[in-house]
């Protein structure tokens, strides 16, 4: 990706984009699956983009990674001991689960170059892959879920948007396969896009999960570098989810966020009804 006057821009539509002033472009490669760009920005530190969309920045990655791990962590009947991450090649979700005390984490990433870029530029996140509690597999997550005999307390779909290699991660067939590898009381969570700019993504995740799981809920959070800053996650279980008391906090997550993130604006409620 070429810079225009030292700015990287993520285009949301033909009429709108979010731009970051950058001091340098550190990397631009085309893998077998996607294009990866790495920029050094003035306000947000290093920025990782895949196919032109922001995946994480040094300054605000903690928000996304806390939301996709710490919220579902508190929805299982007891603290989960093991987890499966599909995607998440930067290591941020695995790093957070280690901090939460999980004993066994399987992280399945389809593109080894995402892992290599993270090891080079985001060592605080990718250090998770050196931890004895984490098993990193470079393979197709959809095929892994279909073929594995392991079962999990928590399944995290930490993917790009529902297109290209990630499209199948939002399908009913995939959710059916995840249902088969869930321990009793387990939950599954997926990022589901911006309700404002990507309503199809949240509808796709919610409707797909509703066909498979009896309890499906949406929660949201504020992530400054994602489209609109307003981001959604969809969490589900074959069992009724009853939040456990929250006695911990992160930089973003706390007991108030655990409760408030499920309080949805009316237009979001209407998207999923």
From Swiss-Prot:
Entry-linked Gene3D superfamilies: Spermidine synthase, tetramerisation domain, Vaccinia Virus protein VP39
Keyword Cytoplasm applies: yes
Catalytic reactions of this protein: S-adenosyl 3-(methylsulfanyl)propylamine + putrescine = S-methyl-5'-thioadenosine + spermidine + H(+)
Binding site for S-methyl-5'-thioadenosine: 34, 109, 140-141, 165
Signal peptide: none
EC number: 2.5.1.16
EC category name: transferase
Annotated binding of spermidine, by residue: 65, 90, 158-161
Cell inner membrane found in the keyword field: no
Localization of this protein: Cytoplasm
Active site: 158
Coiled-coil residue spans: none
Domain PABS per the UniProt entry, residue ranges: 5-238
Residue intervals passing through the bilayer: none
SUPFAM superfamilies for the chain: S-adenosyl-L-methionine-dependent methyltransferases
Family per similarity comment: Belongs to the spermidine/spermine synthase family.
HAMAP family for the chain: Spermidine_synth
Name this polypeptide is given: Polyamine aminopropyltransferase
Organism: Thermoplasma acidophilum (strain ATCC 25905 / DSM 1728 / JCM 9062 / NBRC 15155 / AMRC-C165)
The encoding gene: speE
């Amino acid at each position: 990706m070429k810079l225009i006057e030292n700015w990287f821009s993520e285009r949301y539509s033909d009429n709108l984009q979010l731009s970051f002033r950058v001091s340098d472009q550190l990397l631009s490669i085309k893998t077998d699956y996607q294009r990866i760009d790495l920029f050094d920005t003035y306000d947000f530190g290093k920025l990782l983009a895949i196919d032109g969309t922001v995946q994480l920045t040094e300054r605000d990655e903690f928000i996304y990674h806390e939301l996709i791990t710490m919220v579902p962590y508190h929805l299982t009947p007891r603290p989960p001991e093991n987890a499966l991450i599909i995607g998440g090649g930067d290591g941020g979700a695995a790093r957070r689960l280690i901090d939460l005390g999980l004993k066994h984490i399987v992280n399945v990433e389809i593109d080894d170059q995402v892992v290599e870029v993270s090891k080079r530029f985001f060592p605080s996140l990718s250090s998770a892959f050196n931890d004895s509690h984490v098993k990193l597999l470079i393979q197709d997550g959809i095929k892994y879920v279909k073929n594995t005999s392991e079962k999990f307390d928590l399944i995290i779909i930490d993917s790009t948007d529902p297109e290209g290699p990630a499209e199948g991660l939002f399908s009913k067939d995939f959710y059916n396969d995840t249902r088969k590898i869930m321990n009793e009381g387990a939950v599954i969570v997926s990022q589901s896009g911006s309700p404002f700019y990507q309503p199809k993504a949240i509808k796709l995740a919610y409707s797909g999960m509703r066909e498979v799981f009896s309890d499906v809920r949406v929660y949201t959070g504020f992530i400054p570098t994602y489209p609109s800053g307003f981001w959604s996650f969809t969490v589900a279980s074959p069992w009724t989810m009853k939040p456990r008391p929250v006695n911990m906090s992160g930089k973003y997550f706390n007991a108030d966020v655990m409760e408030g993130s499920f309080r949805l604006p009316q237009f979001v409620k209407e998207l999923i009804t």
